[in-house]
Amino acid sequence: MRAKKSLVIAAVALPLAAALVVTLALTSKHGSTEPRAFCWGQLSRRDLGQLSTGKGGGYSAEDEPRAYYSGYQKRKFPLCNISQGGAWMAEISVRPSLHNSPWGSDGLDRRAVYESAAPMPHGITGWTGIPHKPQWPSAQLLLPEACREPFRTGDSDVQLRVILRNRQEERWSDTSTRERMTHIATKVGDHLTRKYKCGDENWQKKGQGATPTSKFEHVDPANVCRLRDLKVFTEPEAAEQVRQRTAGTIEDTWSCVTVLDKRLQEQTSTDTGATLAAFTTTRNPHHLTEFKEAHGSSTSGKGFTARIVRCGSREYLLNAKYPVPDKSDAGKFGEKNLLDGETLYADFERAFKQRAQCAG
């Protein structure tokens, strides 16, 4: 009887010991039972470390779905909130498109966004933004059109967003922040397209590194936006009051924005009251198709002119944006010191074709 009782105790003890070994194996060096994978099992502790401005672990994540209305129907979309040490650190979400792509049709008349936006590398319809305080850095990309059906978004694209809930500049550089956000967005994007069988983009491979971006710099009045012979000002002296910022690659997806220097020095939030002329190019097929369906080969409006331009075998969407005369600082400065909108666009197209070595 005693021997039988010993066998029972041993049988119970062995699974408990095994469970203890597993628990210890999963325990981090900080002594916690922190998970090894987060956000639908796609992100590692190392991945989350790329989003953090703190040190150590203590990560947790909740990946409950969030409800949005798609048409008249209430739908649930993936959402993951990430915390470190109990403090909210980042959010990864999927939802119907916000129609806010800086290089898409919905961005034709927007200028201020280019103070912080930069396109993701070639082959990805997405962008990163690191705006002025108090806003947060973000990365956003559009999933392939085939993903509309499984997500049931109708005619709207499916948009993936990564938003960081803390400032990065004290630990990470601008370029590093964009690279790290792109890494997370493309990793989750690849997972979603595989899971829902709506694309095989291999974004993570395409998204290594970041597109070139510059800090705000002085303007050469004879070569604005680093484009040879692009002139924006009625008098060269006006350039002394202006700074410019470029992002991306002009032969692919690119932008340049000019801003009143005094407003930059005030460190105000991004707003159209400070933004002067902005110029963009893209050969992204998604944006070209979207533009053609909405506008044909060209369109213009209050403060912008946009056209499809052929360069050899490639097509580009070019857009020149400019302030209209009003009581804002940009409106008053532009009326006095900037060339008219028609001339700005014509000079920009000419300078682009020269830079891209377009035939004809």
Which positions does each model-derived feature cover?
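Extracytoplasmic low-complexity, Pro/Thr/Ser/Ala/Gly-rich segments
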Residues: 25-107, 200-260, 335-339, 345-360
